[in-house]
């Protein structure tokens, strides 16, 4: 709560490939808000807002930043009442969310971080950077420089062979690139966007010696090797879907919406997370992989889990995010020196 309303509201909005443009408007009586109901923080709005005095610039003046440490549906809002006082709210979006607590159970909310400065927006930004670099980021890569990488996707899309990939890597090595990343198309029967997601084993028609063989050849060039995954997604034309059609998030007896011809696996279910972990762990154990590009190319729709009763369907969105966090935690614990980079069709998820 703030005792007055003499602030400008700054939000960071946009769309795919043009995320986080600053937009500013003056507070007045009523509510200003941003949020997401897409199952992720979205390309449209970031879970971060600033209240600043009208005369604040980059290097002087008061500002308060609010950042939600969460990857799912969120709401951030500021309300000015009839007395011109301001109340800021930030957390899990209340729409389509509820959580049933049994006796003796507890619920942990996401953390909202608030930073104040009287030295301008640049100081506010630097304070958040230092805080997250030292208190949120962790592990082997926290204080290390990231390698310079090249990714084959824009050069080849799905049309590649092992020799074509090695040619790209050799040329990149000559320019000082340190890491070669193989993007979409290396797994299952993945020759286009319609098939293969969920089958995280090498397509030996393209890669005769699999990922293990390719990673050794990239290492022989003198480069590190990285790999693209989209662990949360599945195509209906895949071994995984044929074996477990009930593993997707979908409302019973309703049309199943797809995005990029793919469906969202129900990560609120432990057996689904366990299965994906097992496939990824096997591959990462066998091959020399230094980097993972973790993608998420569609939003969640028809949010329903087959394993939860009707009175707990409001938990699915949040349980899904907890499942994603669990998979990250298990993989990072098992492979602490792999660099994980989060991609959600670009900048679609915090």
Predicted regions and their residues:
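Short acidic, Pro/Gly- and aromatic-enriched capping/linker segments at domain boundaries
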Residues: 82-102, 337
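Polysaccharide-binding surfaces and accessory modules of carbohydrate-active proteins
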Residues: 1-79, 95-97
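Active-site neighborhood of glycoside hydrolase catalytic domains
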Residues: 203-210, 214-221, 241-350
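Short Pro-Gly-centered flexible turn/kink motifs
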Residues: 99-118
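Glycine- and acidic
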Residues: 147-156, 162, 197-201, 261-265, ...
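Glycine-rich, aromatic-flanked loop segments that form ligand/cofactor-binding clefts
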Residues: 48-77, 115-140, 148-151, 177-184, ...
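Non-catalytic terminal segments and appended small domains
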Residues: 2-8, 12-15, 25, 189, ...
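Aromatic- and glycine-enriched glycan-recognition loops and surfaces
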Residues: 156-242, 274-278, 319-332
């Amino acid at each position: 709560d703030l005792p007055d309303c003499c602030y400008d509201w700054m939000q960071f909005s946009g769309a795919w490939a043009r995320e986080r443009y600053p937009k500013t408007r003056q507070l007045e009586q009523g509510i200003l808000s941003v949020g997401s109901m897409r199952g992720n923080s979205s390309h449209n709005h970031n879970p971060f807002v600033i209240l600043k005095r009208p005369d604040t610039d980059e290097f002087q003046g008061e500002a308060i930043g609010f950042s939600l440490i969460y990857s799912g549906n969120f709401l951030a809002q500021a309300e000015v009442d009839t007395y011109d006082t301001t109340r800021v709210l930030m957390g899990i979006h209340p729409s389509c969310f509820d959580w049933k607590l049994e006796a003796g159970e507890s619920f942990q909310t996401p953390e909202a971080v608030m930073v104040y400065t009287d030295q301008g927006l640049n100081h506010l930004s630097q304070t958040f950077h230092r805080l997250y670099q030292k208190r949120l980021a962790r592990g082997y890569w926290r204080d290390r420089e990231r390698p310079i990488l090249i990714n084959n996707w824009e050069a080849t899309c799905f049309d590649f062979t092992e020799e074509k990939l090695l040619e790209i890597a050799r040329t990149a090595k000559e320019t000082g690139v340190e890491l070669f990343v193989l993007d979409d198309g290396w797994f299952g029967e993945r020759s286009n966007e319609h098939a293969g997601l969920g089958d995280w084993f090498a397509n030996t028609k393209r890669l005769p010696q699999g990922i293990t063989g390719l990673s050794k050849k990239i290492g022989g060039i003198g480069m590190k090797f990285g790999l693209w995954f989209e662990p949360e997604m599945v195509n209906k034309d895949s071994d995984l879907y044929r074996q477990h059609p009930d593993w997707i998030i979908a409302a019973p007896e309703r049309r199943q919406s797809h995005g990029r011809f793919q469906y969202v696996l129900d990560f609120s279910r432990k057996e689904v997370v366990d299965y994906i972990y097992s496939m990824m762990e096997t591959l990462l154990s066998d091959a020399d992989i230094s980097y993972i590009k973790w993608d998420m190319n569609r939003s969640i729709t028809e949010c329903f889990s087959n394993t939860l009763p009707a009175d707990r369907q409001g938990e699915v969105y949040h349980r899904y995010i907890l499942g994603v966090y669990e998979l990250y935690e298990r993989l990072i614990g098992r492979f602490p020196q792999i660099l994980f980079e989060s991609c959600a069709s670009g900048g679609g998820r915090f």
